[in-house]
Amino acid sequence: MFNFLRLSNTPQLTALGGVNISQQSDDIGLAFNNPALLTPRMHSQMNAVFNDFYGGIKVFHLSLGYRNEKLNTNFLWGLNYFNYGSITETDAAGNVFGKFRPTDWVMQVSASRSYLEKWNYGAAIKWISSNYGQFRSNGIATDIGVLFSDTTRLFSASFLVKNLGVQLKRYNNAEQEELPFDLQAGITKRLEKAPFSFSLTAQRLQQFDIL
């Protein structure tokens, strides 16, 4: 359930394959995906994305960054909103009861700090909601990330605990469902004399039986 949490929220992440936690950039949209990527350079940054798909499906994303010098902490507020258009509501016999507009959204607050010169760590708290007509659900989750960055060697590595949480309200009193929990690890190496970098990201590390 809540599988929309797996989707990319920003064009740069989509261009990187949809899953990347170690690519450092000034794009605050990447920090929405991994709080350890949130840096002081993102103070006062805003990332706004709108996608219009077939069938009336629309996706909105907004991220805002803020740096508090007194707390020595970086903050991010972000929202991902999915509108699936207008759908006709019927019963099993085909009787029409009207229309409804299903939506999914997640709102989160992230914070990060640096440790020594090469480490950065961060966490995010997420409020998740789904509305499919009479079927509604919500939940709460957290992301926890750590980033190691060696600017001299142009190398970075990160580990991320993603979507660790619980469903608070079930769909129409259905059974309790699990969130799309994920353990991810990634490395990025930038070439010294060329404008390229290579990334390797492993996901779903908690699933030992992958066959």
Features from the language model and the residues they span:
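Active-site-flanking structural segment that lines cofactor/substrate pockets
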Residues: 20-62
